[in-house]
Structure formats: C-alpha cells, structure tokens
UniProtKB/Swiss-Prot annotation:
Name assigned to this protein: Nicotianamine aminotransferase A
InterPro entries according to UniProt: Aminotransferase_I/II_large, PyrdxlP-dep_Trfase, PyrdxlP-dep_Trfase_major, PyrdxlP-dep_Trfase_small, TyrNic_aminoTrfase
Tissue: Expressed in roots, but not in leaves.
Catalytic activity: nicotianamine + 2-oxoglutarate = 3''-deamino-3''-oxonicotianamine + L-glutamate
Low complexity bias spans: 11-29
Enzyme class at the top of the EC tree: transferase
Pfam families linked: Aminotran_1_2 (PF00155)
Primary role: Involved in biosynthesis of mugineic acid family phytosiderophores.
Induction trigger: By iron deficiency. No expression is detected when sufficient iron is present.
Length: 461
C-alpha cells in the first residue's frame, strides 16, 4: 500500500483535481496568486457574419417549412397535411416502380458495388443516361456528355461554382424560382440578376427583359421546365426564343428538367437540348421526381453541346475536376440505373401522372372557389401551383409567411410561402398527395380564410 505524505503527495493529488492553491487552480481561473487567463480571440469567429450564418436559411425551403411546422398545434385533433413538400413518396399511392426497387436490390445483393465509383459516375450508368436522353433530341449523346450527381441538388452545387470562377460573373435566375440556385450563387459570390415569369401568360419567361438585365459578365441563365414552382410547361417556340437570346448574349442555358416526365396536359415536354446547336445547354435531371425516389439521391448533368463550345472553354473539364473532389451517388444505385431506365414500364408513369392529374384538377377547382386566393394559370406539369393571396380581403394577415404560420396553427396545413421563392404574398401548393387529403387540406384553407376575412368583406366565397 502506498502512503501519501502531507507535502508533495497532497499537492500532487490536489493538482490532479484542479484544486491546488497554485498553478493547478489557475487552470480554472481561480488562483489566489495569479490573474485569470486572457480571453482567446478565435479567428474562425469571424464566420458569424458570413452568408451561411446570417442569410442561409432565407434561401431554404426546408428551413422555412420547419419554421412553419413549428406553429402546428401538436395536440390538435386532425392530422397535419403537408402541402408544401415536393416528396410524395410519403404516400403509399406514389410508391416507385417495382422494376426500380428490384434493380437496386439486385445490385446491392451482388456485393460488388459497396466500393467508391469514379467521380463522374460508373461508365455503364452514364451510357444508359446518355441513351435515355438521346431519344428526345436530334443528335446522340455519349457517356462523356453525362456526369452523375447525388441528386439534382448536387448538380446545382457543381454547376454554380464552375460558373463563379470568373471574377465579377453574374447569372440570370427566374422569379419565382427554386431557391437553391440563389443560395448556391450567394455562397460562391456569384451575382444574381432576376428575370420575371409572367403569371397571365402561363408563367412564360419575360424574354424581352433578358437583354436589359444581362451584360458582358453574364455567364448563364436558368430555366425550369416543367416549372417548379408554377406548374407551367414551355412550348417549342418559347424555348427556341430563349435559345436565340442566349446565343445573342453569349451565355449557356442551365435547364432544370427534373420534372420532365410529369406532364399533365396536352402540351408536350420539349428538352432544352433540342436547341443545343443554337446555344450550349447543361441539363439537370434525376430519378427523384419522376420515379418518386428523392431519397435515392441520383441525378445528372447532361451536356447538350454538339458544337463542343463547352469542351473548348473547359466547362466540361471544370465539372469533372469539381466532381473529383466531391461526393458521388451510392455506387449500387448507379449500377442499378441502366435497368431502372430500361425496365420501368410505361404503366408506372401513366399511373403517377393519372394521380397528379386528378389532384391538380381538385386543386385548381378548390382554389377557383375560394375568393381569398387566386390561381392565374392551371398547372400543366410538375407537382406545384403558385397561388396569389388576396390579403386585402383578410384581417390581420400581414404577409405570406404570416398567412402560412397562422394557417398551420389553426388548421394544421403546411404551405410554402412565396417569399422564399421570390414572390411575396404568394404561396406554393403541392398537389402531389392523395386526392382525399388534398381536398381536406384545401377545404381547411378555405375555412381559415373565411374565419379571418375582414369584417366588411362580403359573406360567402
């Protein structure tokens, strides 16, 4: 047995507990004989004033949705109806194709695809996407024209930094639009200039404004077709005009086409790549929306550039180099991709479009019967519609965020405020849900409006 003395042994034991009257206590800033240590100036603390810390949440649908969801009364008697999301996979009726599930399961069970893949994607998967996309354009894409990404979101994350390499560059974004473009541009110090989509013209691009807002530093413009958040589908003639203006301005077109298979009306989906011979196109696509599997995280950037402008200017090289230092989709999902594209039956898409079409009809009808909100254009594609709030008819509703928060609190219905999409005092409604739930949700919106109408408002709706 070891005995400790009352001298050095006690001091050592006390120091071990940070209780010494000497230097050990100074560690706690409590020494009787020494001043407390000076505060450290942490160099990384300057980041508190950065874009991510100060304004990042303003450009996030997810963040604003969480904020609104916090207004819901958890003990309420009715289920929460999520009409703000773009993920109908939560509803069993929107389950993906069995062929897609089988392809992923088979790839996983081989045990051969638990490894890393090349940064740009597996060759067979790239070739399959190229073959799939070539069906809609007058020339053939190769595997080298396709870069696989972790969903459409990473495709945006890849393209924006590539365009931001030039000092002082700017990009043209639609208003309303998808806020991830705005956020990524801000993070990469790429200036944003907006062009409007015109509600009364089916949310067409205000083409006449493009030349006035662009300059020699403009590198690209973004179009979303079929459109999120408006539900529009652009015609061949309209897209041709966009391509001609892009050529005149010397810019490339970023075509967000993740909803390309979700067309509800008679107007067909025209890939922007059809006009790649006029102006180069980077098309963003994914399995997420058309196959209803956003959690699988598989998307792509496809290069439509038959004149090889993007190759000569090293845009394609820059994309490759970015992906080589970034993440990539799960390798087994990449391996499954050729079979998913080849084996998914037309009946699956027919079923999904049938559900969306039925729900879009309900959505449009219910909105038309509610005088407190206005829908300027019936949705033709995607899974969304933009709706104007007639706030002058409502009492104590200050703006779109106030409307959405109070609606969530009183009716347990979640909508997406238009301000996060670039249009204040509008809301985005998703109709990608079970028709009965959508009907219930829109009836709750109507009840909320009637309950909060101005006292001098005419009764009824």
């Amino acid at each position: 047995m070891v005995h400790q003395s009352n001298g050095h042994g006690e001091a050592a034991a006390a120091a071990a507990n940070g209780k010494s009257n000497g230097h050990a206590a100074a560690a706690n800033g409590k020494s009787n004989g020494h001043a407390a240590a000076a505060a450290v100036e942490w160099n990384f603390a300057r980041g508190k004033d950065g874009i991510l810390a100060t304004t990042g949440a303003k450009n996030s649908i997810r963040a604003i949705r969480y904020k609104i969801s916090a207004s819901v009364e958890e003990s309420g008697p009715r289920p929460v109806l999520p009409l703000a999301h773009g993920d109908p996979s939560v509803f069993p009726a929107f389950r993906t194709a069995v062929e897609a599930e089988d392809a992923v399961a088979a790839a996983l069970r081989t045990g051969q695809f638990n490894c890393y893949a090349a940064g740009v994607g597996l060759p067979a998967a790239r070739s399959a996407v190229a073959e799939h996309l070539s069906q809609g354009v007058p020339y053939k894409l190769s595997a080298d024209d396709v870069f696989l990404t972790a969903g459409g979101t990473q495709a945006i994350e890849v393209i924006i930094p590539v365009l931001a390499q030039t000092a002082g560059a700017n990009i043209l974004l639609p208003r309303p639009g998808y806020p991830n473009y705005e956020a990524r541009a801000a993070f990469n110090k790429l200036e944003v200039r907006h062009f409007d989509l015109i509600p009364d013209k089916g949310w067409e691009i205000d083409i006449d404004s493009l030349e006035s807002i662009a300059d020699k530093n403009t590198t690209a413009m973004v179009i979303i077709n079929p459109n999120n958040p408006c539900g529009s589908v652009y015609s061949y003639d309209h897209l041709a005009k966009v391509a001609e203006v892009a050529r005149k301005l010397g810019i490339l077109v970023i075509a967000d086409e993740v909803y390309g298979k979700l067309v509800l009306g008679s107007a067909p989906f025209i890939p922007m790549g059809v006009f790649g011979h006029i102006a180069p196109v980077l098309s963003i696509g994914s399995l997420s929306k058309s196959w209803i599997v956003p959690g699988w995280r598989l998307g792509w950037v496809a290069v439509y550039d038959p004149t090889k402008i993007l190759e000569k200017t090293k845009i394609s090289t820059s994309i490759t180099n970015y992906l080589n230092v970034s993440t990539d989709p799960a390798t087994f999902v990449q391996e499954a991709l050729p079979k998913i594209l080849e084996n998914t039956k037309a009946d699956f898409f027919k079923r999904i479009i049938g559900l969306l079409k039925e729900s879009s009809e309900i959505c449009y009808r219910e909105i038309k019967e509610n005088k407190y909100i206005t829908c300027p254009h019936k949705p033709e594609g995607s899974m969304f519609v933009m709706v104007k709030l007639n706030l002058h008819l409502l009492e104590e509703i200050h703006d779109d965020i106030d409307f959405c928060c109070k609606l969530a609190k009183e009716e347990s219905v979640i909508l997406c405020p238009g301000s996060v999409l670039g249009m204040e005092n509008w809301v985005r409604i998703t109709f990608a849900c079970v028709p009965s739930s959508l009907q219930d949700g829109l009836e709750r919106v109507k009840s909320f409006c009637q309950r909060n109408k101005k006292k001098n408002s005419i009764n009824g709706c």
